[in-house]
């Protein structure tokens, strides 16, 4: 009986010893760790990327170059930058500027500060003005809204005998003219940051214009 107990104890010790893994020395970097053998010990083979389930989120955007992806390889609602798009340039125009400007510096068309003081203070207003803000004597925006422009009365189209399938053309005041519209009523659920592509008739389509190329300009 004692021999049987000793034999079982030794067997358990051997099994336990075999379960311990030797420390491997692999001269390789595995981003997702190492593969394991049947004993659960690491071996010198890289594990594959773990599968991640991406959400079936729908983006109401048109991206000519496709969508960006996150760290898990899932698409996100951001467009890839075009290969033709010029890289953004760093602003370095204030290196030699010794001026102190209370209201900050004037910025150029590229958004870079110039060595020139701004006349206007930083504009802060919690009022939304649908027709724009009034400006002061220096041309700076104020927190007063412009009045709505007076609506011009439109002439009656009783004398117009035309039937227009797509409706009538409207002038700059929004008044109908006795002229047929070539374009159908435009309906599109895609927002185009740089406007919509137009067809051969000059009518808007539900395709977005590409981002315009920027010139490679240095800010000075």
Curated annotation (Swiss-Prot):
Q: Which InterPro entries match?
A: Antistasin-like, CRIM1, Hirudin/antistatin
Annotated GO molecular function terms are: heparin binding; serine-type endopeptidase inhibitor activity
Which UniProt keywords are present, listed alphabetically? Heparin-binding, Protease inhibitor, Repeat, Secreted, Serine protease inhibitor, Signal
Q: Which residues form a coiled coil?
A: none
Where's it found, cell-wise?
Answer: Secreted
Could you say which residues are annotated as the site Reactive bond?
27-28, 60-61, 98-99, 161-162
Q: Which SUPFAM superfamilies match?
A: Leech antihemostatic proteins
Domain Antistasin-like, by residue range, is 21-46, 54-79, 91-117, 120-145, 154-180, 183-208
Q: Does the keyword Repeat apply?
A: yes
Endpoints of the signal sequence:
1-19
Q: What superkingdom does the record give?
A: Eukaryota
Q: Does the keyword Secreted apply?
A: yes
One Pfam family of this protein, by short name?
A: Antistasin
Q: In which tissues is it expressed?
A: Gland cells. It is more strongly expressed in the head than in the gastric tissue.
Q: Which GO terms describe its cellular component?
A: extracellular region; plasma membrane
State the family named in the UniProt similarity comment for this chain. Answer: Belongs to the protease inhibitor I15 (antistasin) family.
Q: What function does this protein fulfil?
A: This highly disulfide-bonded protein is a potent inhibitor of factor Xa. Facilitates digestion of tissues and may also protect the gastric tissues from its own digestive enzymes. May have therapeutic utility as an anticoagulant. Also exhibits a strong metastatic activity.
Q: What is this protein called?
A: Antistasin
Originating species: Hydra vulgaris
